[in-house]
Amino acid sequence: MSKLEALQVFLLEKLNEKNEIPNTSHLEFDGKKLGPQEAQSAILSLAAKNMIEFSRHEIEIYNLTAEGENICANGSHEAKVYNEICASMSGLNIGELKKKLGNSAGIGQGRAFKLGWIKKDGDKLVKNTDSITDETPKVLSEIKEHGTISDSKTLTDLKKRKLVERNKIMYFSLRKGPNFSLQIEKLNTDLTAEMITSRSWESAKFKSYNFAAEGIPPAGGCLHPLMKVREEFRKFFFELGFEEMPTNNFVESGFWNFDALFVPQQHSARDAQDTFFLKVPASTDKLPDPEYVARVKATHENGGETKGIGYRAPFSLEETRKLVLRTHTTAVSANMLYKLAQNGFHPAKYFSIDRVFRNETVDATHLAEFHQVEGVICDRNITLGDLIGFLEVFFGKMNVKNLRFKPAYNPYTEPSLEVFSYHEKLGKWVEVGNSGMFRPEMLEPMGLPKDVRCLGFGLSLERPTMIKYGVADIRQLIGPKVNLDLIEASPAVRLDKEE
């Protein structure tokens, strides 16, 4: 008989004697206390046959540390200090006390002062009371016997002094099951060809199926948390009647990435420390319609046909031909708006969610590449109020409420607004997006009618993902430090539901 089978028989016999076992940790098996791990295997096996029923319990107990054991046996440090001072008759200075008690002197002296057992007289320590009661060893002895005491304040003090430590103990209570018996019947787990041939299966007993048991996790691929949140955003946009823009073009010319957006060619964002420039090929010969390029050039230099004055600086075609890794998906939005103007304007709503690249220092909240969520609304005679109203609807779908809007600056939007929401857990206002109305200097050279207004807004995909999945460092979400277990275990997400 194996040890497991012997333990099963032992438990059944104990149950037969008493009908119930309230606490398995009080049992002794094979000459020692029955531990929870050892008992669990036998209990689960018997419960699967409905021979017993059980409940699992967990309690907290306190054990003495090595120092606690020493004090329990030999008395507290403060009592030793008091006794040495009493024995000296005239008191002791600190140096003499350390020679007699060693490390106990420093620990015990402070406690003895606190309890009012000793006082200072000149450079000596003298007793302050004729007698003391050393309660600490008594309390520790009670904890050693019972695992705890009723006085929570004293228990907290002992924990702070590192005389006791808390442990969790698991135990089981057992009752007889519907199939209780002292004989353990072996149940079949498989229906074999031999059993079918001999018809022995008709009288055989089989182990019941456990339909609540977890199956083996599928070995297939898993969606990254970013992709799950991305699909939630796409759903919101489609519900609001938006059309998705094609964004499968990571490389853009300086024209679409900057110039078409009315970003000055002298802007710091166009420096190598902020933008990734391609080496091979370093530039492109493919620019849009020369007339459009000429209108953009004139708008930059002197305002062109718009009412503005431009940047009053030369416009370099060499600069506009440079190839970069796109720094924002607004380059795609500009291309779509240009096509909208060429094909005959009609009210439109576009969105995109894709990767962009910035030459930034990588840290816990910044990466050199990340995902931008962007939306554009074009119609006649729409205003900043329409933008604010739409943003309240859009962020409301993500359960982000209580918005505030702060004036901001963007080269291609005016007016521009930063969007803030009050974060209940952080207890402060946090930025959740950026927005604005595209400038006439961007729209009119495209050929859009003068009464057409375009509203734009954007946010990162990573920030809401980090909040929803409780990720503090963005490098744990994207890059070589990503834990594959995080991806496999990440649940489905609903941005419109509170956690």
Curated annotation (Swiss-Prot):
InterPro entries: aa-tRNA-synth_II (IPR006195), aa-tRNA-synth_II/BPL/LPL (IPR045864), Phe-tRNA-synth_IIc_asu (IPR004529), Phenylalanyl-tRNA_Synthase (IPR002319), PheRS_DBD3 (IPR040725)
Catalytic activity: tRNA(Phe) + L-phenylalanine + ATP = L-phenylalanyl-tRNA(Phe) + AMP + diphosphate + H(+)
Gene Ontology BP terms: cytoplasmic translation; phenylalanyl-tRNA aminoacylation
Family annotation (PROSITE patterns): AA_TRNA_LIGASE_II
Leading EC class: ligase
Gene Ontology cellular-component terms listed: cytoplasm; cytosol; phenylalanine-tRNA ligase complex
Pfam families, A to Z: PheRS_DBD3 (PF18553), tRNA-synt_2d (PF01409)
Residues noted as binding L-phenylalanine in the record, renumbered to the chain: 330, 372-374, 412, 438
Lineage top rank: taxon: Eukaryota
EC number(s) stated in the UniProt entry for this protein: 6.1.1.20
UniProt KW keywords: Aminoacyl-tRNA synthetase, ATP-binding, Cytoplasm, Ligase, Magnesium, Metal-binding, Nucleotide-binding, Protein biosynthesis
Gene3D superfamilies named in the record: 1.10.10.2320, 1.10.10.2330, 3.30.1370.240, Bira Bifunctional Protein, Domain 2
Compartments where found: Cytoplasm
Binding residue positions for Mg(2+): 414
Molecular function GO labels: ATP binding; magnesium ion binding; phenylalanine-tRNA ligase activity; tRNA binding
Cofactor(s) for this UniProt protein: Mg(2+)
Record text on subunit structure and interactions: Tetramer of two alpha and two beta subunits.
Protein family: Belongs to the class-II aminoacyl-tRNA synthetase family. Phe-tRNA synthetase alpha subunit type 2 subfamily.
Protein name per the record: Phenylalanine--tRNA ligase alpha subunit
